[in-house]
């Protein structure tokens, strides 16, 4: 089977499964999910450590994202018996199963980020010529 036939079959299957696929993608394909899971994949992390490592994330955005990830079974939240009380977040086996596709996506972004930015600039420089 050639590459285009494979892509056509994948595209047809994705469209047929859209009722199942879209809600899941909505839960994992937001601004911070990939980055949060990438940070906690190697080892569990506390909230402030996550906040320090995720440049630009607000306290509220991180708290909301972690709650959503816990609710969706991708992250566990453990209250630590320390003074003051600490909370640690760890990736679940389900969350860990996203590692390979996320690594592929991050690699693609690193390899093609300049091309995407150049295309954006070309488009923006065209103005409203349509």
Residue ranges, per PLM feature:
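Alpha-helical linker/hinge and terminal dimerization helices associated
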Residues: 34, 38, 72, 101-116
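Recognition helices and adjacent regulatory flanks at domain boundaries
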Residues: 1-19, 24, 53, 65, ...
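Canonical helix-turn-helix DNA-binding module
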Residues: 44-85
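Short amphipathic alpha-helical/adjacent loop interface patches that line ligand
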Residues: 54, 66, 95, 99-102, ...
């Amino acid at each position: 089977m050639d590459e285009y036939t494979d892509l056509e079959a994948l595209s047809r299957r994705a469209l047929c499964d859209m009722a199942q696929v879209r809600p899941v993608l909505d839960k994992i394909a937001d601004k911070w999910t990939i980055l949060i899971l990438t940070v906690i994949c190697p080892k569990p992390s506390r909230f402030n450590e996550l906040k320090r490592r995720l440049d630009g994330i607000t306290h509220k955005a991180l708290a909301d994202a972690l709650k959503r990830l816990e609710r969706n079974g991708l992250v566990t939240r453990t209250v630590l018996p320390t003074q003051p009380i600490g909370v640690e977040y760890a990736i679940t086996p389900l969350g860990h199963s996203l590692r390979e596709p996320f690594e592929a996506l991050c690699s693609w972004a690193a390899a093609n980020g300049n091309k995407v930015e150049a295309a954006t600039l070309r488009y923006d420089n065209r103005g409203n010529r349509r």
